Amino acid sequence: MSTNPYVKFTSQQVAKPYLVFALILFVGQILFGLVMGVQYIFGDFLFPLIPFNIARMVHTNLLIVWLLFGFMGAAYYLIPEEADRELHSPKLAMFLFWVFAIAGVLTILGYLFVPYAGLAKMTGNDLWPTMGREFLEQPLVTKMGIVVVCLGFLYNVGMTVLKGRKTAINVVMMTGLIGLAVMFLFAFYNPENLTRDKFYWWYVVHLWVEGVWELIMAAMLAYVLIKITGVDREVIEKWLYVIVAMALISGILGTGHHYFWIGAPTVWLWVGSIFSTLEPLPFFAMVLFAFNMVNRRRREHPNKAASLWAMGTTVTAFLGAGVWGFLHTLAPVNYYTHGTQLTAAHGHLAFYGAYAMIVMTFISYAMPKLRNIGEAPDNKAQVLEMWGFWLMTISMIFLTLFLSAAGVVQIWLQRIPEDGAALGFMATQDQLVLFYWLRLLSGVIFLIGLVVYLLSFRQRARAELTAEVAAGHA
């Protein structure tokens, strides 16, 4: 049992460095996003120090890695409690934390300070070519390191579940985590045929974010809702199974909407369009799930900020992944919209709503306990955190709207006219500068919201110190 009265098991404390490091990487991701926002307007900004392609690579890689740290931290916190036993090996968890953190930092530094071709040569890409593909730019050694970390992580949490109590939350969480690791193995398959390459590339990208990651999100949300509402576990688990079934049925065959224009058989035009229309359903179910559970709550949990994050993530995920995804998922529409700023609008709101917000939901609930503060931080800290929530969420919604408007104009000028009348790509970009300024403004406000959110931890730190002093006098 734990010496910290607010966590059940001592080994749950290993979640803390994972969640803290996730937030540090999140800050880095936003800073590089702002660099890109300026570069869309002033193309030579920070050139040649940080070219646009490098800034984008760092921005997207930091997104992936900080979310993985968040998922791992959440797993290390909730799985021991759900399994009703200590984590199998806290020492292994801490060892893997340092391996993953050091490898991640070195990879980002490699992107920034070593020419990409030189980095590929240094890391053995000629022996097993895996680099150069969007989102999978990591050197071979980094990819292999990710596999090692995933295997060690799955062994650790898997043994905890096998030796402990099995719950729906544990089973769904483990299914999502195993799927995450298995799908990543396709990152090592890089065929010369471009159609085949793209076909399997989407196994990693789509089946992560619109497949197994949804399972992880649903398990994390269910766990937090049980804790903050006091609703019967059986009720929440029934909802969880329905959401998981919807996510898998729609998500797996929904991969087809990425196969429209890569040279795949025409059957994917139908399969992708039909099943992609079902993909908003699990996110809509999460909205109903969260609000229904909060309305049926049996207790007033003192952590109001965690409740706000829990409800906010479902609504924003439904808007970003559901509504904005559906807007351009049908093949006749996607013919004009794919690869435009409308795609970027969908990606930003979906990732923020579904995955960034669920990690921050979990941090909001778990961090006061991990820091021995109590069920919730003081009222000032919660008010500050909720200000951060609203600033980040509203600015992201406006950023999405501005990118959507840019996408519509881009389609109107570049895609719809016949070849002779259509503007070229760069000429079209010149017509979108106003929207890029508005997007940059939204990004700056988002950063302000993130800073406000992080400042709430200073308030918590004072409460933490007070708790430690009180414990010392006891």
Role assignments for model-derived ranges:
Residues 49-64, 202-210, 265-276, 307, ...:
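Transmembrane alpha-helix entry/boundary detector in multi-pass membrane proteins
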Residues 1-3, 150-162, 191-195, 216-231, ...:
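Juxtamembrane interface elements at the cytosolic ends of transmembrane helices
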Residues 1-16, 371-379, 409-433, 460-474:
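Extramembrane terminal tails and long inter-domain/linker segments of multi-pass membrane proteins
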Residues 15-25, 88-101, 169-179, 230-250, ...:
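Interfacial and helix-entry/exit segments of alpha-helical transmembrane bundles
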Residues 34-41, 47, 54-161, 186-192, ...:
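Membrane-interface helix-loop-helix modules in multi-pass inner-membrane proteins
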Residues 61-75, 141-156, 209-224, 277-291, ...:
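Hydrophobic cores of alpha-helical transmembrane segments in multi-pass inner/ER membrane proteins
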Residues 201, 205, 218-335, 343:
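Membrane-embedded translocation segments of transport machinery
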